[in-house]
Amino acid sequence: EAVGIAGVILAAGIDKIEVPLNSPSPFDSINTIVEAYGDQALIGAGTVLTTAQVKQVRSAGGQLVVSPNCDPAVIAATIAEGMQSWPGVFTPSEALAALQAGATGLKLFPGDMAGPKGLKAMRAILPLGTQVYAVGGAAPDNFSKWIEASADGFGLGSAIYKPGDTSETVAAKAQAIVTAFDAI
């Protein structure tokens, strides 16, 4: 299932795929997706909480580590393994701590609590060029508000895939998301 779902997401034009570690057999899924599409996309894991999980993601072929929190040890381990680190942050202090630890970019989470206004305010203290993705609450109907607030991208999770979704369902969701994003 993982390869088929990843394939339709890529076909829609989305080139970053994270497999949540709280899903069934996540490391097997990462490995099979990397084998099929590793040259076409940045593939890795979400909900990464420990340095041991970082090593497992790398062993599965992943190049991307996304966390719901800001753990400097996880960030450092991810960078040491040559992967991209996108920790979850909610406050300016967490954002700056993540960047100091070497984060590639930031996952503003939960985005619906911070809102576009929260992101816009946080930009005042972030180093120029810092990539920030809004996660949790970003959807096609509010992409434009997030972009106006300087979001660089989005993490979409269940907006694009829920367990039990068919490839056709995911393809339709992914295409609608890309169409909405491209319309901005």
What are the residue ranges of the model-derived segments?
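Histidine/lysine/aspartate-rich catalytic loop segments that bind and position anionic ligands
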Residues: 64, 68-114
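CoA-thioester-processing core
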Residues: 85, 116-126, 132
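Glycine-rich phosphate-binding active-site loops on the catalytic face of alpha/beta enzymes
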Residues: 64, 68-74, 108-115, 149-173
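Conserved N-terminal beta1-alpha1 strand-loop-helix module at the mouth
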Residues: 1-63, 80, 139-141, 162-184
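Glycine-rich beta-to-alpha transition loops that act as phosphate-gripper elements at the mouths
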Residues: 23, 43-51, 67-71, 87-92, ...
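Conserved functional loop/turn residues at catalytic and ligand-binding sites
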Residues: 13, 37, 61, 69, ...
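Structural preference for beta-strand elements that scaffold enzyme active sites
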Residues: 16-18, 40-44, 63-64, 84-86, ...
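Catalytic cores of alpha/beta
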Residues: 5, 50-60, 93-101, 124, ...
